[in-house]
UniProtKB/Swiss-Prot annotation:
Belongs to the D-glutamate cyclase family. It is an enzyme of class 4 (lyase). NCBIfam families: PRK05463.1. HAMAP family: Hydro_lyase. SUPFAM superfamilies: PSTPO5379-like. It comes from the Bacteria. Gene3D superfamilies: PSTPO5379-like, PSTPO5379-like domain. Its EC number is 4.2.1.-. This is Putative hydro-lyase ABAYE2440. InterPro entries: D-Glu_cyclase, Putative_hydro-lyase, UPF0317. Keywords: Lyase. It holds the Pfam family D-Glu_cyclase.
Length: 268
């Protein structure tokens, strides 16, 4: 649970402006938008699958930290005023029997056709990036205006009911002398994935080529930098694929919902 702290009105305005911009058709990755405000991932599954997914998230809190659950027919989250999860992500993915069948920028029609969907909002590692930057650690994909690289790893998640799958990880190249600071900062924020799950040696995670991510864009890795991997909120999409859930809606990786909760509210 986040701490109830005073929010800078300018930050609230920036978050609302970002949501309105997205609602009006902005279609790019959201890293760096409304800096300092929490961003979230999303997965919507049929009511019949909701308990299995809730249990899956509970058993895998580092990759699937649940920040809010919206019952069927509910599209506004307590995490943001004037919100609609059907329009306020820049891009959505539509899944049938574990296969992605479409990508859209407005999901109202699809939600209306599937009124039994239960939605889970999942913490996102974009929410610790401002803290990294404030500590003088460059976040490469923000600097280069690209999407964060994400990979389907060989780390098996704890299954629950009919749902199983492997962890998806995001990667940020960090100078070797700054890794300990990056670990300290992110470890204080378990609700947005917390400390890294792996440092260096991508092959240990089953990643054959770090320059060919499964989701997002490749990041430059300069001399003296080490690839650092965090659990990622795209893990539910890997579970959808592996478990052949009959229908689901998710965000597109890197295209997040921006809340009214400051990042620092999650710091322990």
């Amino acid at each position: 649970m986040y701490k109830d702290i005073k929010v800078d009105p300018a930050q609230l305005e920036a978050a609302l402006d970002a949501r309105l911009k997205i609602r009006a058709g902005f279609d790019k990755p959201t890293a760096g938008m409304a800096a300092g405000m929490t961003q979230v991932n999303m997965i919507s599954v049929p009511r019949d699958w909701a308990y299995d997914f809730l249990l899956y998230a509970h058993r895998n809190p580092q990759s699937c930290p649940v920040l809010d659950v919206l019952e069927e027919g509910i599209y506004a989250t307590k995490l943001a005023a004037d919100s609609d999860i059907r329009t306020d992500f820049p891009r959505y993915r539509i899944w049938k029997d574990g296969e992605m069948v479409d990508e859209v920028t407005d999901a109202r029609e699809i939600y209306n056709a599937h009124p039994d969907l239960v939605t889970f909002l999942i913490g996102c590692s974009f929410s610790f990036e401002t803290a990294l930057q404030e500590a003088g650690i460059e976040v490469r994909h923000i600097h280069d205006d690209t999407n964060v690289p994400m990979y389907l790893s060989n780390i098996k998640c704890e299954p629950a009911g009919r749902i199983s799958g492997n962890m998806v990880v995001s990667m940020r190249p960090i100078p070797s002398h700054q890794i300990s600071e990056a670990v300290k900062i992110t470890a204080r924020m378990p609700s947005v994935h917390g400390a890294p799950v792996h440092i260096g040696h991508p092959e240990s995670l089953g990643i054959k080529d770090v320059n060919k991510p499964d989701f997002g864009d490749a990041s430059r890795i300069e001399a003296g930098e080490i690839p650092v991997f965090w659990a990622c909120g795209v893990t539910p999409q890997a579970a959808v694929m592996n478990s052949k859930i009959p229908f689901a809606i998710s965000h597109a990786p890197g295209y997040m919902f921006i809340t009214d909760i400051p990042d620092r509210a999650w710091m322990g």
